[in-house]
Amino acid sequence: MMKTILGERAEICFAMKANPFLIGPLKDTADKFEVCSPGEFHICETVGIPMERIVLSGVNKEKCDITHAMHTYGNAGVYTIESRKHLELLEMCAKEENITIHALIRVTSGNQFGIDEEEAFNIVSKKNDYPHVRIEGIQCYSGTQKKKFSKIEKELHWLDDILTRLKETCDYDAEVLEYGPGFYIPYFE
């Protein structure tokens, strides 16, 4: 249903933290799986989700976790950039593996997830300092259980503004926008 509404260019990325028990039934439905912990990553490996369909997100990744993914799967998958320090860790690991990885800058909508706009612009303006990390776009998770579409619409305008300013100020064309809108799910109705 979502693909019908959003069109064929849109991909559905299931956030495993929502319910890791759904990964089996969604294996052939979701285009990608957002994985935020080593445990979630292990579940994906066990179930046989190809790395090409995994977005390694969140700050709960240590060097050994990143190195394992890169050493085992090369440059498959997408990594999120949670901070400049995290970007430097991704660059170091990718350089050690002699690969160039795909990454998205995780921008915050004011919650605890991601980096602020100013830092995102600084990272994009210095993207050539990180030759082993190909920044393909931005990611934003803005919360959950939103009942009003007007809030989602406002966030989409805000993200569009960021992408427009990145083009104007940094001559950067984002290829990917990953947006977690936090649709309302009536669990108890």
Give, region by region, the residue ranges found by the protein language model.
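An N-cap/entry alpha-helix motif that binds or orients negatively charged groups
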Residues: 1-7
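Active-site-proximal loop/short-helix segments
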Residues: 139, 174-189
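Active-site-proximal beta-alpha core segment in soluble small-molecule metabolic enzymes
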Residues: 10-176
